[in-house]
Amino acid sequence: MATAVRGLKLQTEDYFLTDKNVVMVAERHPQPVFPLHHHDFDELVIVWRGNGLHLWNDVPYRITRGDMFYVSANDRHSYESVHGLELDNILYIRNRLTLSADWQRLLPGGEHPQSQRHWCLGSEGMDTLREKVDALRQECMKSDALSLQLSEALLLQIALLAARYRHTPDNPQLADAHQLDMLMNALRASIAAPFRFEAFCEQHHFSARSLRSRFKEQTGMSVPHYLRQLRLCKAMELLRYDLQTIGDIAALCGFEDSNYFSVVFHQAFGVSPSAYRQRFLNVE
């Protein structure tokens, strides 16, 4: 198999204010297309709005508001197909953090499976975290002793609050969730199963028109388009790592007709599912 491409390496001296600072915030409002890269620092990525394709260690994620990633220094990732994507990267040098905290648990690194480093936030969690991130953004632009300590203390607060409010992408609907959060959770849980938006709204006594409009405003996509993107990202993952037939993969990703799946996949990525899979097969 061909050697994995490492891409660009982002250096600490280009992103941290001084060699004393161990925490920084890289604001990306918007986040442009950015090529494959890795770092010599770790980062916590929080997506606020818009959408894009996050390719992380060769696994595709269709990201939008509420997605959160714990990215380690050795991870390789890129951003593609971005549309109004806004996110913050909270950068930190793990081995230079001085506060007595269980950093390995609060900010899981490369020793944890990738599936345990992708989480989602609801509206309440996003509002709470955004306030702390904004405070850190201001504090980390100073290098006096008190500001350095305050920056690390704010990172600890962010890590604790993230652990409190985060949930897995396929988490069941939460009874106290906001309408938009409930819809996002339902869509993430409907990759393999049919999803009927009108029935969902009727079941929860939501205004379909209002919710549809708010979803488009926050994500930059319609509900059907977002669900299709989730399904296509799952298909990309299965085509890379699973040996099931194209038809079986189509069914697992919510497409009843494998021919239709092939057409949609080709329209999205410019290549057929079988040709895409061929790229990742071992070459003798």
Curated annotation (Swiss-Prot):
Pfam families: AraC_binding, HTH_18. Residues 181-279 form the HTH araC/xylS-type domain. Keywords: Activator, Cytoplasm, DNA-binding, Repeat, Rhamnose metabolism, Transcription, Transcription regulation. The keyword Repressor does not apply. GO terms for cellular component: cytoplasm. The record marks D248 as: Interaction with sigma-70. It comes from the Bacteria. One of its GO terms (biological process) is positive regulation of DNA-templated transcription. Signal peptide: none annotated. PROSITE patterns: HTH_ARAC_FAMILY_2 (PS01124). Residues 198-219, 246-269 bind DNA. Activates expression of the rhaSR operon in response to L-rhamnose. This is HTH-type transcriptional activator RhaR. The lineage of its organism: Bacteria, Pseudomonadati, Pseudomonadota, Gammaproteobacteria, Enterobacterales. The gene is rhaR.
